[in-house]
Amino acid sequence: MRINPTTSDPGVSTLEKKNLGRIAQIIGPVLDVAFPPGKMPNIYNALIVKGRDTAGQPMNVTCEVQQLLGNNRVRAVAMSATDGLTRGMEVIDTGAPLSVPVGGATLGRIFNVLGEPVDNLGPVDTRTTSPIHRSAPAFTQLDTKLSIFETGIKVVDLLAPYRRGGKIGLFGGAGVGKTVLIMELINNIAKAHGGVSVFGGVGERTREGNDLYMEMKESGVINEQNIAESKVALVYGQMNEPPGARMRVGLTALTMAEYFRDVNEQDVLLFIDNIFRFVQAGSEVSALLGRMPSAVGYQPTLSTEMGSLQERITSTKEGSITSIQAVYVPADDLTDPAPATTFAHLDATTVLSRGLAAKGIYPAVDPLDSTSTMLQPRIVGEEHYEIAQRVKETLQRYKELQDIIAILGLDELSEEDRLTVARARKIERFLSQPFFVAEVFTGSPGKYVGLAETIRGFQLILSGELDSLPEQAFYLVGNIDEATAKAMNLEMESKLKK
């Protein structure tokens, strides 16, 4: 952890001058610390416990002050395991909140909640640090213009467009392509917007975090040969870590993203996986801090904690942070306080469907379940809005007819319904797209499709101009011209076979 960026050896030369306290009580990950009268630390100050455990091994535990209890005592939450700590151990008040490294040197690296690199690649080459607790940008700094954040992914841009500086909820189970979609977005923002990404793994499985890192190296999102060319910084606070680390790792990732937005004036993508674990960690700590639980056992400060994180994710006149947050819904209950509080902050939802993944349609984004507040004629324009609505109507009608088709077959449908089904199947396939990050697995080159090209393609399918083309011509292509070229190739291949 960096305490003071002005010293050559951060966190050492300044510590001797700081206030010293003693551990008075240990309740799991929560410590009570007694300080001399008049030397009390401020709330959110970082405290460091240095000493030796009962086995004689050196210990270095960082804590964060949460409450001032009176009688010269404070209550703090530990950011690492408290095993081996004993009453009476010396505690150093650093006089400042937790600070983490920021800037270009963080790209391609993995950090823990304290901003310490955990990838065995040596120290981070930066002296610039930033405290993890900051207030949200003032109203006067905000960019109030509603603009679309183009991702180059057809299904997202057309049917559930992302807002620049907005918050998107990503819903999907295991194995439906969440990770690949996240990596493609990281890749596309780097290429199309010259932006960077920060990934915050909040309370996720260690194996998943490791898999993501390996896949990013394989797909080129993290460049092993030249780490500075990487497009993403990773911050992990895994499931096995104490609740203090899981509660604050989201803020560490956000602080790194804010630097790219405010100082480098870039468009930043911030991924949080999983936002529910942030709430869960807060509820674990809340009871230990002596707060009365609220509905369903959650912390009474749930809305405040969520708001303090979400309100910092926004567009300013310098740049933007667009956040994509994986949302776990406990027991599929959308009225649970954790997802319900999250929904209040979201501008769009991207729902991944296991049914589409089973059909081999990737990205497996459900076009009917995914929503966006940006899909309004005054924001996206009349043409975009009308095409999106017609695409949804066609797919909805196809969904309604599927039971009839399953029982009676296509022949029993009216001419109009048969045409609707044919176009819907083409639309469904045209919503698929080859990804850059999947090239190493599929062998197909990735495609970035601009919004205008996307609208033109669906306009041609809906108008009936392409009714004569086979539906497989629309599968895993970029723009509509590639679909017509693929149809010609398929026709030539079938003629040669004859």
Curated annotation (Swiss-Prot):
InterPro entries for this protein: AAA+_ATPase, ATP-synt_VA_C, ATP_synth_F1_bsu, ATPase_a/bsu_AS, ATPase_alpha/beta_chains, ATPase_F1/V1/A1_a/bsu_N, ATPase_F1/V1/A1_a/bsu_N_sf, ATPase_F1/V1/A1_a/bsu_nucl-bd
GO molecular function: ATP binding; ATP hydrolysis activity; proton-transporting ATP synthase activity, rotational mechanism
Reaction catalysed by this enzyme: ATP + H2O + 4 H(+)(in) = ADP + phosphate + 5 H(+)(out)
Pfam families listed in its UniProt record: ATP-synt_ab (PF00006), ATP-synt_ab_N (PF02874), ATP-synt_VA_C (PF22919)
Family, per entry: Belongs to the ATPase alpha/beta chains family.
The protein's assembly and partners: F-type ATPases have 2 components, CF(1) - the catalytic core - and CF(0) - the membrane proton channel. CF(1) has five subunits: alpha(3), beta(3), gamma(1), delta(1), epsilon(1). CF(0) has four main subunits: a(1), b(1), b'(1) and c(9-12).
Its job: Produces ATP from ADP in the presence of a proton gradient across the membrane. The catalytic sites are hosted primarily by the beta subunits.
Name of the featured protein: ATP synthase subunit beta, chloroplastic
Gene symbol of the encoding locus: atpB
